[in-house]
């Protein structure tokens, strides 16, 4: 007859594997969060949210706060705008979108800064703090992406994209890679947030009741 491991020893083995797997997933989550922050910073800074096409009257492209539009008399692009130069941003919708995307970016960066709390606070609590921050970041990115097209009816955008351009109607222009990444980043932030919540609750239950030792009784 095969003798099984004592309940206490089996619980220790399960606990060791449980902790090891949780740490591996935690490292993966942290690495993905850092990579995601770089992605969000890039799409925030780059002015390639919408741009020209072969049918546009002029060449150019627009971002959240900066844009470049071709000169009628030459092929040179005239660039304007900056994150602190609100007067040069073409529309209120662009300003609002910039605010919410920036909010999402800083929340993601803030969740990375919270990694330092792992050394001084309860691990489960830190995961949950980061999860809420990443969920809020996803909300900010989503609002930014929804509001941004509301500014397509500005005079600067219409000058480049044509008179058919209006709110949520891009005319002859096309969506560029930064806007596409911003839309995809909403899902990324939600996945990271969900993963952080799972890790937080796993930390709360590192040793489930079913595996708690109930003495040295052998079966």
From Swiss-Prot:
Residues 46-99, 150-178 are extracellular. It holds the Pfam family L_HMGIC_fpl. Keywords: Cell membrane, Deafness, Disease variant, Ion transport, Membrane, Non-syndromic deafness, Transmembrane, Transmembrane helix, Transport. It is a multi-pass membrane protein. Its main location: membrane. It is linked to Deafness, autosomal recessive, 67: A form of non-syndromic sensorineural hearing loss. Sensorineural deafness results from damage to the neural receptors of the inner ear, the nerve pathways to the brain, or the area of the brain that receives sound information. This is LHFPL tetraspan subfamily member 5 protein. It comes from Homo sapiens (Human).
